[in-house]
Amino acid sequence: MKRGIDIVQALKNSKRSKSSDDSVESKLSKASPDLSQYAAVQISKEDVTVNPEVKSTIDNHKKEPPSIASSIKKSPKTVIGKHANSTKKPKKRTPLDQQFIDLKNEYPDCVLAIQVGYKYKFFGVDAVPVSRILNIMFIPGNLTERDATHDKFAYCSVPDNRLHIHLQRLLTNGLKVAVVSQTESAVLREAESSKGLFLREVTAIYTKATYIEEGSGDFISCITWNGTSAGAVTVQPCTGEIIVEDFSEKEPEALSELQTYLHHLRPSEIIVTDNEATKENDKLSRLLKSFGGARISYKPFDEVSPIEELLPASIANYYVTNHSTTTTQCISQLITYLKDFSLDQIFTVPSNVSKFSTKMYMNLPGNTLKALEIFQNSSGTEKGTLFWHLDHTHTKMGRRMLQKWVSKPLIDNASIQERLDAIESLMNYNYAVEVFEGIIKKIGRDESDWEKSMIKIHYTANGSQNRVTRKEVVQLLLQFRSVIDTVYKFKSSFKDSSISKLLQSMFSELAELASTPIVNDLLSRVKIEAVYREEVEDQKKEFFDLDSHPHEGIKSELNAISELEQALQDELVEIKKIIKKPVDYMTVSREPYLIALRGDSGPQDWLKISATKTVTRYRPPKVSKLYKELLYHQEKLIQQCDEAFATFLKDIDSHYTYFSRLIKIVAEIDCLLSLKATSSSNSGYSKPILSDKQMIKAKRSRNPVIENLTSTSQYVANDIEISYDENRVLIITGPNMGGKSSYVKQVALIALMTQIGCYLPCESAIVGIFDTILVRMGAEDNILKGESTFMVEMSECSTIIKSLTNKSLVILDEIGRGTGTEDGIAIAYSIISYLIEEPRLPLTLFITHYPSLKVLEDTHPKNVANYHMGFMEVAKADQEWPDVTFLYTLKRGVVSNSYGLNVARLAGIPSEIITKAFKVAEALKQDIEDSELSSMGQILKSEQSSASKLVEIDRIVSYI
């Protein structure tokens, strides 16, 4: 077969064509309306965000057709036929081509993976991005049904047994893929005398977030914004988790709350209800665009049915009764969207619903998560984050649970104490606990994911395509049994006084679950060894224990198969009589029931199957008839086995709540073991003492993340002493790179780890309970929002001021540096003064390079303390400026020099430039300090009363 010519040559040929409408560029351009399908959303809206690589392909087709040549040319295997310029009329379509067109019209937003025999093929315009992404051969042909350059559609293909491997690559690149499977076999067609094309149907549709087979646990969020109210619902299809939230009625607060919501959950898909309020809200649009990694789509709500029409009455009533109108609108939108993926049954388990923000947990705004690098560092990875430091979980459900614990620290003193006591208990040896930990480790080594397996069972049991294998189900039940058996065996040991109350309650609940025979009853119905058979069909046929739990349909087909096999053996006796030779059946190339004879000596009515130079293999007429009947009943047997398995899954799903309780407890124990590992594997960790007062007092504390990244012996420990009674506001100065930011982050992480329930990296600690940590750190603009560095800084300060409580921990880093020196000093002074005198009295750490702010300690000696990060100046004979050695120790007092020249030297700036800068700095230093002190003195003199101070603050806040 000729491979055709390179696409570049095809484009050159097309330029010589008399009719530009028939050129390759024209055909690709004509195809452009269909190419919006390669995102899971339409690209008619400017606000839609799609995968950059996919968007490039779409745009190249849509706007600059010739550029697609360079896009496809990247794959050396991609070719286009040499008759690209042909103007011949289209021939009559093949039935398969027409089937593709019909399916494409029904699913225009999907790339179709169509099963044809033992391959999955991508036809027409779908083949263009698929061949490029997978780097596979592109077979030339028509791209759309309007084309007439070839007899058939272009295509590329992948083996059916590797479909899901390739699917992951396509989904990662932003495609939405519909899998079209052959839903009837050749054997059944022949037995039932079916004619015509094989029946094919869309059996699954996937996007990155809805691909739960090998998914990464992505979230899908739906947001409804009605102008006066806003709400969101987020689902995690691979676990069944549903997270709901209603936001403030005032727009600024609602946007801030939505930003925090999205920062915590980091959805890969965001669906926005498309209404007038949404269209008119530019701030909402800009906020959503700032989440660049998420696919954003706008869906009209008037096309969605009410929730009462989408769910069973009792479940719909639960949502309507317990949730707001905006929340139920989001649920209806998500049910409609997920129905295409056969995942809409996620909402039939109301026990999986949870509120995002409750008064039981510390509030961590999005800026705090980002600044403190809780889950993601500045490079976008996990290493070097607080979660990375704490995560020693063994199981996947334990890891997800720990993420919740870290994102939602406790604020109830008793609950925190329970976790701390549990960790202390786990650090003391107990044989029963040791055995239980071994089981959890084994579950982790097996890479089992109980939550994912259970939700896959739920989807399949409620009408979705089969998403779970028999082996996965049996392994899940066996692991459940290992937990239950261990708890039952050691139930008296788990009541030991050395085990904390929290652990005792967990093991007590497990013992209660172990007392029911659910797991053993389910396992008694199957043959465990069957799932380890190599052939999938053997697994299916031998899965059930038919002696103890008979299935009439399966038994009927097995009897029919047995009779046919006996008939075939009886026929063999007759064959031996006919040919008068001691022959036996043989199997060659998966073709059974063959009779091999030398040469071509078989009877003429025998069907010749295969031959070699010396042997011919036959299937006699009656054997052929019996074999076809056997194949038919074998197919029917598999159908019966699949139906019985579906019933079995429904029985498991009927105990969903029971298994969810079991999974939750095991995940929580895994989390406690993880915190124990953090607390005990590091030297110098101690159990904090909880205080009812707002305070953090820690002896020789360290930044846990930095210490973990470096050698413990190299880390410099510091005391922390900040409290409501004294030193409520710390003003911290010091040289650049001297450790100021690391220190204030350390304070925040100490507070967080305490309320997560973990031991702390210090010799001893007394810590109060905070309801929120508010952080303003870093210098960056926000181009998408049209905000300068200073605007971002002021906006974040404004949010902090509005969010303050009397239990807040506030961290502000170099406020005022985004503007001129005079304005910067004035704003920094006014904001810190506001926090000092604010009746809500938050604990505050304020980093600054304005040494003139030191006067605030003089005016508020009880509340304010000046500190700096220690250093040493080292004079050098060959340079005018001193070198600086950082000591990283926190000391009392103020530093008037930031030692920026030392940073310039470390960065490799030439010495002659630094020398000149030093001379200029020395000349300016005194003038600036005099000016700052004069300005500060004037401000202090003008503050004759608290009223005048509030006027100043009001001016600053209004400016913000």
Curated annotation (Swiss-Prot):
Major location category of this protein: nucleus
Keywords in alphabetical order: ATP-binding, DNA damage, DNA repair, DNA-binding, Nucleotide-binding, Nucleus
GO molecular function terms noted in the UniProt entry: ATP binding; ATP-dependent DNA damage sensor activity; double-strand/single-strand DNA junction binding; heteroduplex DNA loop binding; Y-form DNA binding
UniProt region (Mispair-binding domain), positions on chain: 87-209
Superkingdom per UniProt: Eukaryota
Family label: Belongs to the DNA mismatch repair MutS family. MSH3 subfamily.
Subunit annotation: Heterodimer consisting of MSH2-MSH3 (MutS beta). Forms a ternary complex with MutL alpha (MLH1-PMS1).
Name this protein carries in UniProt: DNA mismatch repair protein MSH3
Organism of this sequence: Meyerozyma guilliermondii (strain ATCC 6260 / CBS 566 / DSM 6381 / JCM 1539 / NBRC 10279 / NRRL Y-324)
Gene behind this protein: MSH3
